[in-house]
Amino acid sequence: MGTILDKIVEQKKKEVAELYETYTPVKTKRKTHSLVEALQQFTVIAEVKRASPSKGDINLHVDVRKQVGTYEDCGAGAVSVLTDGQFFKGSFHDLQTAREESNIPLLCKDFIIDKIQIDRAYETGADIILLIVAALTKEKLKELYSYVLEKGLEAIVEVHDEQELETAIQLNPHVIGINNRNLKTFEVDLSQTEKLGKRLNEEKLLWISESGIHSKEDITRVKRAGAKGVLVGEALMTSSSISSFFEDCKVNI
């Protein structure tokens, strides 16, 4: 059967093959916005997430333009957009809409396994590319990270355990994302942030906490662990008061 991640990667291989048949990258350069600069103070990366394999439909018919505008008005330092269609019901159209609406750093949240996906994300308006260590060989991770740099973009290199963390540290990446969700089981454990954060603090690397962040208590916990930001999707997509969530993020520790 394989894990959920295995299934997603298999689907991405099909999508990449289709991209090579249907898409020709444009060789134009454009201005980009820096997440690293945004993370000089504690930052919320607010996500547009219609659905997920673990939760099903979350906010399927969201008005992306309105949601992103609200995020920016409330003080988001960056916006993340799911572009995977099969498992998360996102699209590159959502990414494009977010770019049209916003002038803050924009993350293409997908399962990137090939350079052509980075080309497409760049052309659609992304400033940041997510590279998931669990989805890539060490060689492929290094190759894709180099390509991100070549394009003038930034990367969040995502890890879930100690082994993946050591692989990520070798790249000395812009930002490391500790995913509290195990992509093989989709279970969430916020203690991963505390556990792996210690090592990243020792290395003096810039890092954020991703997944499972729903409350003021969660924000306090990851701030105490040393996170310079949080990536939040579900909590914001289902919130009746997005501004209240952002107020909670201002908690002092």
Swiss-Prot record:
EC number: 4.1.1.48
Biological processes, Gene Ontology terms: L-tryptophan biosynthetic process
Keywords, comma-separated and alphabetical: Amino-acid biosynthesis, Aromatic amino acid biosynthesis, Decarboxylase, Lyase, Tryptophan biosynthesis
GO molecular function, one term: indole-3-glycerol-phosphate synthase activity
A Pfam family reported for this protein in Swiss-Prot or TrEMBL: IGPS
Catalytic reaction(s) noted: 1-(2-carboxyphenylamino)-1-deoxy-D-ribulose 5-phosphate + H(+) = (1S,2R)-1-C-(indol-3-yl)glycerol 3-phosphate + CO2 + H2O
Pathway: Amino-acid biosynthesis; L-tryptophan biosynthesis; L-tryptophan from chorismate: step 4/5
InterPro entries membership: Aldolase_TIM (IPR013785), Indole-3-glycerol_P_synth (IPR045186), Indole-3-glycerol_P_synth_dom (IPR013798), Indole-3-GlycerolPSynthase_CS (IPR001468), RibuloseP-bd_barrel (IPR011060)
Entry annotated with the keyword Acyltransferase: no
Family in the record: Belongs to the TrpC family.
Protein name: Indole-3-glycerol phosphate synthase
Gene source species: Bacillus cereus (strain G9842)
